[in-house]
Amino acid sequence: MNINLTMFGQLIMFTMFTWFCMKFVWPPIVMTMEERKKRIESGLLAAERGRSEQEEMQAKAQEMINQSKDQAAEIIANATRQASNMVEDAKDVALKEAGKVKAQAQAQLEQDTIQTRNELKNQMSDLIMQGVSVVLAKEVDVKVHQKMLGKLSQSLS
């Protein structure tokens, strides 16, 4: 056999093998590679979307936390204001009640003072009557009367 003929035969076989591979083997391999490429691209896009959605959700969560903190601070401020108002109202009520109690005590003191003065006047009038009856029981003497009235005034003061 001739080397050229062998080479020519191998060239024909290689061409047929290449044509067969290009016609029947290569398209499924290329199609499988394209499908995998598309699947990988869609996976990467989904991962990127997931990452961006995660960042958005984290931003929203942080915003909600900040809003909650602001609301909590506002609630605390309102509660503090309300508590101070309640304390002020209680102080006002206590001062009014203290004023009433003071006025009642003052009125009671004045009433007791008047009652004591009346009792003292009654006792004084009794003592004066006793002194007058003693003076009248004895003889009417100016010197003696002045001494008795002096003793009476000393006993009264």
Curated annotation (Swiss-Prot):
Transmembrane spans: 7-29
InterPro entries, A to Z: ATP_synth_B-like_membr_sf, ATP_synth_b/b'su_bac/chlpt, ATP_synth_F0_bsu_bac, ATP_synthase_B_chain
Lineage top rank: taxon: Bacteria
Keywords: ATP synthesis, Cell inner membrane, Cell membrane, CF(0), Hydrogen ion transport, Ion transport, Membrane, Transmembrane, Transmembrane helix, Transport
Topology of this chain in the membrane: Single-pass membrane protein
GO cellular component, one term: proton-transporting ATP synthase complex
A Pfam short name: ATP-synt_B
Record's subcellular location: Cell inner membrane
First-listed, main subcellular location of the protein, grouped into a coarse class: membrane
GO molecular function, one term: proton-transporting ATPase activity, rotational mechanism
Family in the record: Belongs to the ATPase B chain family.
UniProt-listed HAMAP family: ATP_synth_b_bprime (MF_01398)
Function noted in UniProt: F(1)F(0) ATP synthase produces ATP from ADP in the presence of a proton or sodium gradient. F-type ATPases consist of two structural domains, F(1) containing the extramembraneous catalytic core and F(0) containing the membrane proton channel, linked together by a central stalk and a peripheral stalk. During catalysis, ATP synthesis in the catalytic domain of F(1) is coupled via a rotary mechanism of the central stalk subunits to proton translocation.
Assembly description: F-type ATPases have 2 components, F(1) - the catalytic core - and F(0) - the membrane proton channel. F(1) has five subunits: alpha(3), beta(3), gamma(1), delta(1), epsilon(1). F(0) has three main subunits: a(1), b(2) and c(10-14). The alpha and beta chains form an alternating ring which encloses part of the gamma chain. F(1) is attached to F(0) by a central stalk formed by the gamma and epsilon chains, while a peripheral stalk is formed by the delta and b chains.
Protein name: ATP synthase subunit b
Gene name linked to the record: atpF
